[in-house]
Amino acid sequence: MFRVSGNQISITAGDTALMAICPDETGYVPTANDRAIFTVRERPKRRTLIEKTIAPEADGRFVVCFESEDTARLKPREYVWDVRLAIQANVDENGEVTDAEQIITPCPPGILFVMAAIGELSGAANNGFGQPVNQTLRIRFEKLMQGPRGEPGRDGAKG
C-alpha cells in the first residue's frame, strides 16, 4: 500500500513506490542544475534513514523512487521526512550535492507511516517502476530573488 495525503506518506514496509514532487504552477520551476534532497529520519535531528538526491524531470518535477530496501528494514511506526531544494547545485561524482547557490525548504516536514507487511513474497517481484507515478505531492517552490543590496529582485520580493 502506498498513499500520499497532504504531507503524510503511508507505505507498507518493503514495498516500492513512486512519488512526484511537482512545482506549483505559480512558483519557481526547477531547472536541470537544481536538485531535491528527500530525507527520512527517526525524528528531527536524529540519524538519517533514507536520503535521496534527485535531479528534476524536464517539466520540473522530482520523482522519489522508494525501493524495497528503503523501507524493508524500518520498523512499523512514524518517521519524519522533508525535502530541500538545492538551486544551481554542484554535485560530486556520486550525484550528491556539495554546494548550491541557495538551499530552500519548500514545505513543512511531514510524517512517513511505515506499516508492517503481513504476507511474504516468494521469488523476485516486479518493482513496478515501469508504471506511472503512484502519487503526487504539489509544492510551491519559492526561489529567493534579490538585488545586490538586498532589494526586491526582478522576479519577486526578497524571501
Residue ranges of model-derived segments:
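N-terminal assembly/attachment segments of tailed bacteriophage virion structural proteins
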Residues: 1-126
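Collagen/collagen-like triple-helix sequence repeat recognition
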Residues: 122-159
